Design a protein with these regions (language model features):
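Alpha-to-beta junction loops
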Residues: 63-73, 117, 140, 161-164
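Short, low-complexity disordered leader/linker segments with a strong preference
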Residues: 1-19, 42
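Short, well-ordered beta-strand elements
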Residues: 15-27, 45-51, 118-119
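Short helix-initiation/N-cap motifs at beta->coil->alpha
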Residues: 49-60, 147-173
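Ligand-binding "clamshell"
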Residues: 80-92, 107
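A conserved helix-loop-strand patch within extracytoplasmic ligand-binding domains
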Residues: 92-142
Length: 173
């Protein structure tokens, strides 16, 4: 996502370089940007990367013009953020595909899931739905008919393992 100020920078066809400020999550986004920083430096650009540990501030600092861009979110999250917060952020382009998975924690695999175990899911609208759909695809829960990309824990129709779904900030999951 980027602000109008960053859009004007992106539209400028200069080779003089300058500074680009980016708000990013630590992994993998800041790591990827560190590699891009080397390439940009060869072209006369200074990439300043600031790591944020939440999913709200990076959008707020771009919207305010304090940063040129951010790098941490997928398009559904960006669109939902704009709708909820009245912001005007835009997608500047895709960089990488971020897979979503189920990680068994202390278990070797999902077959060791026991009745009453706790499963953490992101608490933001788009990522929570993705997590719940993934749990459904793996037979852990069943969602109500029609629960799609806006599903919440309230849409769980069946929970045969009586797992506890704990909603946490995405960066904590």
């Amino acid at each position: 996502a980027e602000s109008e100020a960053a859009e004007s920078v992106a539209d400028t066809q200069t080779t003089e370089g300058g500074t680009i400020t980016v708000a990013a999550s630590a992994t993998p986004h800041a790591e990827i940007l560190e590699e891009a920083k080397k390439i940009l430096a060869d072209q006369g650009w200074d990439l300043e990367i600031t790591i944020f540990d939440d999913y709200v501030l990076p959008n707020e600092v771009v919207e305010s013009g304090e940063f040129d861009a951010n790098y941490f979110q997928h398009i559904p999250y960006l669109e939902n953020f704009n709708a909820e917060k009245g912001t005007h952020l835009v997608n500047a382009g895709g960089i990488h595909y971020e897979p979503f998975g189920i990680y068994p924690g202390t278990k070797k695999d999902l077959s060791e899931l026991a009745d009453g175990d706790t499963i953490a899911v992101p608490n933001d609208t788009t990522n929570e739905a993705r997590a719940l759909l993934l749990l459904q695809d793996n037979g852990i829960i069943t969602l109500k008919d029609g629960a799609g990309l806006e599903a919440t824990v309230n849409d769980i129709a069946e929970n045969p393992h009586n797992v506890k779904i704990e909603e946490l900030a995405a960066e904590q999951v």
